[in-house]
């Protein structure tokens, strides 16, 4: 496979969230109170909140608007990375251990007790997704945390269900403002590393449309899963190429500054690598925010001044 070359450079803008400065080995991140936003001073506070009366999230949101002011050469987005709730594949791997899972059981569709091909949420996973919804409702009202304007999800069943349970029909008191429309978009690029593991083989297009009708499917979304192979595992480089292609798509075509992405632990680890952020391993049902900066990459001709007019 020939890897693509992005025309954008992505950088994690750190110093805003507690997980931005990870002190040791990768840790299993859970949803922190207020998503771990650090109560700090912003250069926009002088005009926006001179008396320091506004909530920390209100001041951060105003600063994000400032970063994206007209004339800025970079684009900034706040990405809420939501890992799906516990799936049956997670249960099986925990029971038998990673070595046995990787060598044998991950290649099967299930056993006599459970099915983990395109794994669905367990009862625990459903509660985790519902806890996400409760978090969003509480944080939006009490912390003034801005809700995402756009929702993206991996087409795997556990991600679709997590996203739907976390955001569909989310209600806030009238005084707290309106909830952005829930019009989620499915992105193949967000999938977990492809191949061999049946838990990462998706259902058909028809099944997704029937079971999750609110989710829009991108053009070219095939009826059958044409990306997953029974005996070939996607390389880490190919996985990273996919995630970078997702960033390219979103930063090039979606103007909203705040998005949610419901996907997989492996996908978010790749994201951390791409943006230069300390590795964050997300626990099932957790939400971790990242502030990401995108800048155009000048080609060599532009740099040496030989580009044509």
Residue ranges and their predicted role:
Residues 85-88, 156-159, 190-192, 226, ...:
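Short, solvent-exposed loop/turn segments at secondary-structure junctions
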Residues 90-96, 164, 196-200, 273-274, ...:
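Short aromatic-enriched loop/helix-cap "lid" or pocket-rim segments at secondary-structure transitions
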Residues 239-255:
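A short, acidic, amphipathic alpha-helical segment used as a generic capping/interface helix at domain edges
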């Amino acid at each position: 496979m020939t890897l693509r070359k992005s025309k954008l450079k992505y950088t994690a803008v750190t110093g805003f969230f507690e997980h931005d400065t990870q002190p040791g080995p990768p840790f299993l991140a859970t949803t922190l109170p207020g998503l771990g936003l650090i109560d700090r001073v912003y250069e926009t506070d002088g005009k926006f909140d001179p008396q320091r009366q506004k909530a920390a999230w209100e001041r951060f949101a105003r600063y994000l608007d400032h970063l994206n002011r007209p004339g800025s050469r970079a684009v900034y987005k706040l990405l809420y990375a939501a890992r799906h709730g516990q799936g049956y594949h997670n249960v099986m791997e925990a029971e038998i251990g990673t070595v046995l899972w990787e060598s044998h059981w991950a290649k099967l569709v299930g056993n006599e007790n459970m099915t983990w091909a395109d794994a669905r949420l367990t009862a625990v996973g459903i509660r985790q997704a519902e806890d996400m919804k409760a978090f969003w409702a509480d944080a939006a009202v009490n912390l003034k945390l801005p809700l995402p304007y756009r929702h993206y999800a991996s087409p795997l069943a556990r991600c679709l269900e997590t996203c739907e349970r976390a955001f569909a029909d989310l209600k806030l008191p009238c005084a707290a403002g309106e909830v952005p429309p829930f019009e989620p978009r499915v992105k193949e690029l967000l999938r977990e590393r492809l191949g061999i593991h049946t838990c990462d083989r998706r259902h058909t297009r028809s099944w997704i449309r029937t079971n999750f009708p609110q989710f829009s499917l991108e053009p070219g979304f095939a009826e059958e899963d044409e990306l997953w192979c029974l005996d070939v595992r996607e390389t880490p480089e190919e996985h990273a190429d996919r995630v970078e292609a997702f960033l390219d798509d979103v930063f090039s075509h979606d103007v909203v500054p705040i998005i949610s992405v419901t996907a997989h632990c492996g996908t978010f680890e790749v994201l951390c690598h791409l943006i230069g952020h300390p590795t964050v391993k997300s626990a099932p049902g957790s939400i971790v925010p990242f502030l990401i900066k995108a800048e155009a990459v000048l080609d060599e001709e532009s740099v040496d001044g030989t580009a044509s007019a």
